[in-house]
Swiss-Prot record:
It holds the Pfam family Ribosom_S12_S23. GO terms for cellular component: small ribosomal subunit. Gene3D superfamilies: Nucleic acid-binding proteins. It comes from Pseudomonas putida (strain GB-1). SUPFAM superfamilies: Nucleic acid-binding proteins. This is Small ribosomal subunit protein uS12. With S4 and S5 plays an important role in translational accuracy.
Amino acid sequence: MATINQLVRQPRKRSVEKSDVPALQNCPQRRGVCTRVYTTTPRKPNSALRKVCRVRLTNGFEVSSYIGGEGHNLQEHSVVLIRGGRVKDLPGVRYHTVRGSLDTSGVKGRNQGRSKYGTKRPK
């Protein structure tokens, strides 16, 4: 146990919390350009073809970003907005593309949870 004198001379170190999304640099979202759009398979025990894109951000970072929802219109050189949020069964994918903003279209025919997929309200 440290004495009060020792603590006055050298206070206790605060532990620095490590960010889960370092490429965002404390911003809520970041803009970037798709360098590669591809599908990948998840870890065991799941099985699927998950849609992922590699994005070069405006701050110079290059990250993998998950494309949620059914169907998408992204290709190389598409400008996308990414947010934080990892995909548990895809190693190395720590970001999500924001649907319905910039070059990313919303999900067609979506009626529930529309705000998460950038779908306008049906008339």
